[in-house]
Amino acid sequence: MIPTSVTNSPPPAGLGQNGASASLGSATAAAGGGMLSGLGMVAVSGCGSAGTGAQNNYGSVVLGLASLILEGRPIADDEYQQQTVGVVGSGAATAGSGGGRLSPRPSTSRAAINITTNPYGSMGGSENRAVNGSGSTGSPSSSSLTHQRWTQKLCQLRQISPAAQTMSAEPELVSLAINDLNKDHGDYEIVRRVMLNRAGGTGLVSSAGGGTNNSSAASSPGSNSSDNILHSLQSLATTCLRGGPALAPPPSVESRPLNLAFHWSGLGGSGGRGLGFGGGAASISNTPTTTATATASSGASSSASRPKHGPHCDQFLRKMGLAKGEMPSEAEEHICDMSYVNMTCNRWRAYCMKMEAILARREPVCIEVYLGPVSHKLLLEQWIICGREKVPPPTMTLPSLCSAIRSQLYFSQIVAWCDLLRKCDPSVYDSGRVIFSNCGNNAGDLATSYTTCGGQKRPRLNIFYRIKQHTTTNSNSGLHQEDGFSAKANVHNFPNVNVSESYSISVSVRSLPRINGGLPHVEPLPPSPAPRSLRPCGGDPASTPTGGGGLHAATPTGLGARTSALTPTTTAGGSNCDNGKPGMGQILDELDGDTSLSHRERQLQKYRKRMQRRDKKRERKATPDRLNSRQQSEEPMDEGEESQTQSQTTSETQSLALTLQQPRRIAMISTGTQTSLSSCQQCGSEKTLLCLSCTGGGGAHGGSNGTANGSTNGATDDGDDSDTTASEMEETSSCSLSSADLIVGTPRNNAELLLQAIQRTPKNRNRKPHPGVLDQVSCRNADLNGGQNNNLLKATPATSGCQVCKRQKTQHNFANGKVHQPTNGKQASNGYASMHLEAEKQPDVVQILATKLTPNIERCSLNPVERCKTPPPGVADHIVVQFKTPLSQVPAKHQPDAMVPLQQQQLGKSSSKPAQLRLNCGSNLLESETPPPMTSPQMRKALPKVNLTTIFCSSAPIAIGCPAFSFDPAALSHARSQLLAPDVSVTPPVQKSFSAPTLPHAASLSVSPRFSKQALAAHKRRSRHLSDRSDRSSLGSDEQLSDEDLESGLCSPAGGSPLKCRARLAAQFGGRPLLGNLEESLLQRRLMPKIEVMGFTLQLGASGGFCPTQVNIPAVSYFYELHGETLSTPYLCEIRLPRKGYSVPRSGTVQATLLNPIGTVVRMFVIPYDMRDMPPLHRTFIRQRILAEELSQDQDEGHKVPRSPTVTSTTSKLGHFISAEQMKRLRYSIHLKFQTSRSGRLCLHTDIRLLISRRTDCDTAAAHAKGVLEAPNELVTDTMMPAEPRYSARQESAGRI
């Protein structure tokens, strides 16, 4: 039955079912409160008053939709399959003397006996006292036909054809164990039981309807039409979930366990001694039977509500519209017949108890659909049902919402996988995600004389659900991470549906994208076809509390599967293998099912899992002595350890449980007594991270993390699986800066875990550095500043390279000359411990704290013992700046000791990865950092290839003094004048290629003039053309833009600070004098623009002897503002062409259409040309102007300017330079550049520039002011070409083309 009582606190867990001997659901409300009858949900207010009707309707709709999501998917078809049952053992007896019921009750079955020994139940004992309370007087009926009809109705709900499979005619028995040890809401373990037939196994025992007036056999089969299905869905969410009003119960005697909040109405057969085991229901109690009033709370037992129906009985099907017949009275009490209670009833009861507390708090319900097994679960769907205040009118009704949900369920990937399973696809069976039914020693087997393997149920998908409270998070990044999806989930929000006048319900589903290639496989594959069975301890056959060998998930739900690891395996003698400790699977399942964990904690747990996996990979490469010590420390932990799956090893389970759930407890290994790690092993003084009283090195066991290894010949305490050794703690202690991990029994707080996750610190290992490296470190520390050591972290060498800052290209090392701490090169000490020790000894010294972001930096620096430091405030004496360069042989430092690794690197093979340039700037180190004479020429040769744009072009001043480069005010002013020189300011000194020289100003860096001239010419030549990878059909891609465009920002979105944008525009447009008129100055980029606008597009095409492909090229527009001008200024559009240009016929027409950012045509230019006489390797240009010509009354017709757009004469009427008056009439202008190749191919090259005047609106306004409908002028086209010479030779030689 469905429990209907809801209190303010979650109900205590217990063991009991509804059926022949016990009826769950007759319960009292807490503290004398009223009760709203919903399907498993009653909202009780604090004062005990009944909720409003809207709340009742909301709860009914939520549970109705939840039942549709949970039970409407055709994945549990094997519940209705025909099963061949062997010969029944002699223990199968019937007891029906009390109420005339002839239900089989296997009193000697293992399942019935072992239920009483459930350690999770609060009741023990071997007797069940069932009392005939309601006097069942139902007449016997054909149970097989009724069960087949109910099965058919449920198949209709799940859209399964009954003819597609063999329907079972056997009722089912289900035992439900509730675990309340570690959960507030309890957890449920459902194990399926099949009733035994009588001898022969063909017919079923006729049984009477256990409920009062249960006329299930008299109802006729329902219709299978779509309208009836739709009507049933509407009824499911509205009316069928409400029960009738509570009436006074009939006089009955009820057995009430001591710790249960529910009353158990005895409805079973005889009152004699026996098992009330009917329909998956059992009321087990070791206490004498008491009356209902004996333990009634606040005298409310007399107002107990009637048991409600579930999705398994005939009355439910009638209300859904799937069964026709007269509706029984709402006032009568309905109790399902125990013979027909199947798995669906009890599973739905468990689901309702899951949702009970969530709905009582008015919280959203989240239903997660997983693909098992639990150890390798994969989140497939996440359904969220929440109520909210009424929103604007909805676009979907409740029946439509139910239909949409059914469509979503039916066309999901789970159904597709089920089809593969029905087709016996071998890839599905080999995936490890299929539940098989074995012949013997399973949880579903009963204690018969023998069992048969024939007629077993078909395998099915390991699909299980989890119902929890939905918690909303503020983080928008990594959705598939924060919700448990392995990939970015597809989100579908159904329209809101109003359930009352002021309240609506919202349903959304997040699903994993479709997985191609069938079922995802479990790696590694499980060795046995039963991936969820528990391993027997010591080889002895273990028995679970519900009978059988290992727990086996026989339902598509995850309730049985998730709690299988929660049941401790017991031997025949009753002793527990793991000494009473819960299994590791329980800890992991608690983590998985704990809804109180916040998003941040879940992210931290995932991070810790990744750290553990990475460390286990490293442990395979550990030294032999470390391997021996770890093997000795982990050997005693393998005994008696139960695993959640056979593919998951004990060490993995232990490490996960140790890291994620339980506080750190360290089992010290020593030859004598155990000592706590909170005290030093050498002197016994109390310490946190490092003993502050010891000053010695401590030998090899001093450790790089300040923890003592101790001797490794002892044994760990095998009584605690969560203990770890000191050597193992040494591997993990560097993951956090706090010392709480090393204190015995101290749990981590959230702030500490968050700090660790932010830092992303890899674990330090106790590496044994090379003696030569240590000597080099000691020599370097001794030579630098006369024995001064500014960075204690230099003492630990890095042998494996930087593991975190892989993308770091700049390292700033700030050191303070006030700290004096000599170090011993032979001692490998932890940097933090040394700093802590130094802080204790010198409290008056400014402490330099390291971020520990890069504990081992090799690829970030040529000096392998340097570490990143956070710059302390006010420290600018010694600044080290690194820049990424394309050279691998750049000198590392301007000091003698840095030349040693450089010379070794130059003698050997060159490194493939780029090195870094280190500029040591400090006035107090000039003497020691002067380069020796022998290395100065090498440095000078390498300097021209170094990209110093960050130094020279940086907007922020660098107030440092460098021995290699002088940054005094005179030099800075000279460098500024050189940067703003007219001859080189057009081409910025930035280049992406590593093959050509980068600095056009190489002459100022002691480079020969010839080399500088060649470099500057190559730079101009490269920056003028685009890449060779251009494609004429798609010129808008970034890879086809030139280096100059990418770095100057011409073709990039206008972003960045206004100061940087202004400086870039000044470098491109400023510095050159103006030309004859405004048109030339704008076209030749001699004026400084006011603003730069992106998004313009030019459609370029041509026609003639052939028609080239029309292309779309992005354009950049520059707007100007001239002071003192009353009229608006034209704006310039510039379009960069590809390197090879745009090939056109020798004679024809070029059509260019300019589009603004919103896609509207600004102007279409049609330029005719004829260049058939143009020789190869020559160039020319065409400029077309479009002007507004005003017609005067006395103007002679013969002196009008030609208006034909086909004017191709080289002698323009306007000339090359137009006057100021003509400039006022200029509306559009386009400038095209033509050139021919060595083979005579004609093409447009370099760029196209357009001038667009914005006076069209002014012309229209002037026309309307004069009362004229049309504009008082016409547009006149004027085309111009050079006259003498018409074509000019190209500057490049023929060999370069």
Curated annotation (Swiss-Prot):
Bias kind Low complexity: ranges: 133-144, 213-226, 287-305, 643-655, 706-716, 1203-1212
Regions of compositional bias (Basic residues) in chain numbering: 605-620
Ranges of biased composition (kind: Acidic residues): 717-731
Keywords: Nucleus
Region (Required for macropage invasion): 1074-1132
Disulfide bonds: none
A GO term from the CC aspect: nucleus
Region feature Transactivation domain 2 (TAD2), mapped onto this chain: 1150-1158
Region described as Transactivation domain 1 (TAD1): spans on this chain: 174-182
Pfam families: Chromosome_seg, DUF4210
Expression tissues: Expressed in macrophages.
Xref: InterPro entries: Atos-like_C, Atos-like_cons_dom, ATOS_Transcription_Regulators
Region feature Disordered, mapped onto this chain: 1-22, 117-149, 206-227, 287-311, 518-655, 704-741, 1017-1048, 1192-1213
Comp. bias intervals (Polar residues): 564-578
Subcellular location(s) per record: Nucleus
Major subcellular location class: nucleus
Similarity section: Belongs to the ATOS family.
UniProt cross-references to PANTHER family, sorted A to Z: GH03947P (PTHR13199), PROTEIN ATOSSA (PTHR13199:SF11)
Notes on the domains: The protein contains 2 transactivation domains (TAD). Each of these domains may be required for transcriptional activation of a subset of target genes.
Function: Transcription regulator that synchronizes transcriptional and translational programs to promote macrophage invasion of tissues. Required in macrophages for their early invasion into the extended germband. Induces transcriptional expression of metabolic enzymes as well as of the translational regulator pths/DDX47. With pths/DDX47, adjusts transcription and translation of a subset of OXPHOS genes to increase mitochondrial bioenergetics and allow macrophage tissue invasion.
Protein name: Protein Atossa
Organism field: Drosophila melanogaster (Fruit fly)
